[in-house]
From Swiss-Prot:
It comes from the Viruses. The lineage of its organism: Viruses, Varidnaviria, Bamfordvirae, Nucleocytoviricota, Megaviricetes. This is Uncharacterized protein L105.
């Protein structure tokens, strides 16, 4: 038997409606994800968004689109993967975190022009609780 296969086991990620399988080596650099592995079954459960898991695995395999990163940037952030793109920022709007074009926000909503000036030190993450203390 090939020792590489033994050293690099298959991990199954179960969502509500799908199962994804990947080698451990694909996800090993994502510590928050590897912490979720049940050692007795080599499975990860509790992640519900099929589309995100597919994008995440493709990202970890260096096969992704910028559009996918924008759509799931906050989900990546929750797993400890920082997505940084020129001109994009994290903002908290109504308790939900979005990753949006800073240019779009300032051109369409006057509020954000002064908001970004007042909190420049937070760029690119304006979503955090520390903004309340400033």
């Amino acid at each position: 038997m090939n020792s590489t296969i033994i050293d690099d086991p298959i991990v199954t990620i179960k969502t509500l409606s799908k199962q994804f399988q990947t080698r451990y080596s694909t996800i090993e650099n994502c510590n928050e994800l590897t912490k979720l592995i049940d050692k007795s079954t080599n499975c990860i459960t509790g992640l519900t968004n099929d589309e995100f898991i597919e994008v995440l695995l493709n990202y970890l395999r260096n096969n992704y689109s910028e559009e996918d990163l924008i759509k799931f940037a906050n989900d990546f952030k929750l797993l400890g993967i920082n997505i940084e793109m020129d001109g994009y920022v994290f903002v908290n709007i109504g308790g939900k975190i979005f990753f949006l074009s800073k240019n779009f926000l300032t051109h369409n909503f006057n509020y954000f022009e002064s908001f970004f000036k007042n909190y420049q030190q937070c760029d690119p993450d304006y979503s955090a609780d520390h903004l309340k203390d400033m």
